[in-house]
Amino acid sequence: MTGGKSGGKASGSKNAQSRSSKAGLAFPVGRVHRLLRKGNYAQRVGAGAPVYLAAVLEYLAAEILELAGNAARDNKKTRIIPRHLQLAIRNDEELNKLLGHVTIAQGGVLPNIHQNLLPKKTPKSGKGPGSQEL
């Protein structure tokens, strides 16, 4: 039966398995492959490239979400908001380098007070009238 609505699948494939599940990923390998082909990055795209790229993207997303979840927990919140993403990215040296020129809407800025603006610390010496030294 040629030209039917088989969708290009091999005949007799009982349990079809996605490339994402084969690779053990949550990110869609098929969609990444399609975007690599349509993006005019190269004439041809190898079979391993979208799997690798999907794995890298999944790792980066998991890393950012873990740090943002920690920031939300530090602020006693149960929901991650853009402020938590901003704090997570800017406090991590490598993520800040990677996403240095990225603006996060509603992210705010990192809290920072210059040392010259902080109140002076007065040294408290133990040499007073109540000193017990001999």
From Swiss-Prot:
Record's protein name: Histone H2A
N5-methylglutamine modification, residue list: 106
Function statement: Core component of nucleosome which plays a central role in DNA double strand break (DSB) repair. Nucleosomes wrap and compact DNA into chromatin, limiting DNA accessibility to the cellular machineries which require DNA as a template. Histones thereby play a central role in transcription regulation, DNA repair, DNA replication and chromosomal stability. DNA accessibility is regulated via a complex set of post-translational modifications of histones, also called histone code, and nucleosome remodeling.
Lineage: Eukaryota, Fungi, Dikarya, Ascomycota, Pezizomycotina
Site location (Not ubiquitinated): 120
Originating species: Aspergillus niger (strain ATCC MYA-4892 / CBS 513.88 / FGSC A1513)
Residues with PTM Phosphoserine: 131
Entry's family note: Belongs to the histone H2A family.
Membrane spanning residue stretches: none
